[in-house]
Regions:
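Active-site cofactor/substrate anionic-group-binding motifs, chiefly glycine-
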Residues: 72-117
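Short, well-ordered coil/turn segments that N-cap beta-strands
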Residues: 77-80, 106-108, 135-139, 164-166, ...
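Acidic (Asp/Glu)-rich catalytic clusters
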Residues: 100-105, 127-136, 157-164
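An N-cap/entry alpha-helix motif that binds or orients negatively charged groups
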Residues: 5-72, 76
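Hydrophobic faces of well-ordered beta-strands that scaffold small-molecule active sites
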Residues: 80-83, 110-112, 139-143, 170, ...
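Active-site mouth loops of central-metabolism enzymes
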Residues: 83-93, 142-150, 208-213
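A gly/proline- and charged-residue-enriched helix-loop-helix capping module
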Residues: 108-144
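Alpha/beta enzyme core
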Residues: 147-220
Length: 220
């Protein structure tokens, strides 16, 4: 899986160069996806178990089917959000700019990768700035709940404003952090952090996982 690829790549570079710089880590997130087989080998989406019930008298015209939805104050042509992508490295900028432009053209939403790099390396902010390429897109900012716990709301609000985001995704990723060399180990205070941001920020706050799903217990 992608976690294995990331761990293998990061562990090798950690051994060669010491702890990875935040920009190098972001580059290492791109490399496995471009060159390795990162899909699950055994797990599936379970869609193979879905059987659609055929309706013989639908009483509709196909051309009148409307997939558009309203999400976070903006209308999407379909309930699709390309998220969360990348940022923090010059190669990441091209990915963000290209996909954001596609999302803008097709009426989808677009989510940035973790903006932690912007805090640690302000010179990387441009890799997250996609409004020039996607002026109308529903744009979601991104920060990890662990990092947000240590940041004041004013700092996060400034990061959101700098990229012109319509909302903030607070990502939850303990599984990835546990297997990533140099990853976080303190996951306390997450619920309180999200509640604080919901109250303090001028934009909606969304909780999202990075790939392992949200259990019913966590959702409640």
């Amino acid at each position: 899986t992608i976690l294995v690829a990331l761990v293998t790549t990061a562990a090798k570079k950690n051994g060669e160069h010491g702890k990875l710089d935040i920009t190098e880590r972001k580059a290492d997130h791109l490399d496995p996806c471009a060159t390795d087989a990162v899909a699950f080998k055994q797990q599936t989406t379970l869609l193979e178990g879905v059987r659609l019930v055929h309706q013989s008298l639908p009483d509709l015209h196909v051309d009148e089917i409307d997939l558009s939805v309203s999400l976070l104050g903006k209308k999407l042509r379909a309930p699709i959000v390309i998220a969360a992508m990348t940022g923090g490295h010059e190669r990441a900028a091209e990915v963000n700019h290209t996909l954001a432009a596609i999302a803008n053209e097709r009426g989808y939403g677009f989510g940035l990768g973790s903006q932690r790099a912007m805090q640690k390396r302000p010179d990387t902010a441009w890799t997250f700035q996609v409004r020039e390429h996607a002026p109308d897109v529903l744009l979601l900012g991104n920060v990890g709940v662990v990092q947000a716990r240590e940041m004041d709301p004013e700092t996060i609000a400034a990061m959101i404003h700098e990229v012109g985001a319509d909302a903030l995704c607070v990502h939850l990723n303990p599984a990835m952090e546990l297997v990533q060399p140099g990853g976080d180990r303190d996951f306390t205070g997450g619920t309180e952090t999200i509640a604080r941001l919901v109250k303090a920020l001028p934009v909606p706050v969304v909780g999202k996982e990075t790939g392992n799903g949200i259990s019913i217990e966590t959702a409640r």
